[in-house]
Amino acid sequence: MSQWAVPVTLKKEETMENRIITISREHGSGGREIGRKLAEKLGIHCYDAELIQRIVEKSGYPADFVKEKGEDAVGGGISMLLVDRRLGPTHQDTLWKVQSQVISELADKESCVIVGRCADYILQARSDCLTVFIHAAFDKRVERIIKEYGEPEEKAYRRLKDKDKRRMAYYNYYTDKKWGNALNYHVCLDSGELGIDKCVDVLAQLY
């Protein structure tokens, strides 16, 4: 891990009454929809867009910056993360620290579903947290992107390649773990094969 990456202080509490589910996902796998539907089914809060807003309020950074740079590397990958730190910590490093604080505070406050933003790593010391990774075959993710954004196939293909590369670089850098590695999560589900609703049902049974 880079010397400029802000370490997360993880303390395992003696008693934890809340139950947290973190949803990490490949772009185009439907992880955000799964998180939303799961929270509705369980009657708990899903932090996705609202999480971004809370980070905006606490950090003072613009919403677009928080949304894009809170889980994706700037530019093309790990090299940009390293180059940007020649003069010291970057705004992305500061954002990482604030983001970690907000996620930890939410987990302390209530049972909830948290989508993305390395929440699985940030909350890894908690015994009340179930970490999930949602994935799907590349062609099925392309189909979903085309349907969701109305993009031509070639553009959807490029979008996924770029998003995967930047998200992986960000996660690997700040957590010192490999994004998408099954060993980093309690549950990995293929939404392309199972479908959105089946993934929701499986996770609800594990809650």
Model-predicted regions and their roles:
Residues 1-15:
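Short, Lys/Arg-enriched N-terminal segments with co-localized hydrophobic residues
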Residues 17-21, 25, 110:
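Pre-Walker A (Motif I) flank of P-loop NTPase domains
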Residues 23-36:
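Glycine-rich phosphate-binding P-loop
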Residues 45-56:
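Short beta-strand-centered segment that lines the nucleotide-binding/catalytic pocket of NTP-utilizing
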Residues 56-111:
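ATP-dependent small-molecule kinase phosphotransfer cores
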Residues 74-81, 93, 152-197:
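Small-molecule kinase domains that catalyze NTP-dependent phosphoryl transfer to phosphate-bearing small molecules
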Residues 106, 122-126:
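RNA pseudouridine synthases
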Residues 125-148, 153-163:
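Conserved phosphate-donor/acceptor-positioning beta-strand/loop module used by diverse small-molecule
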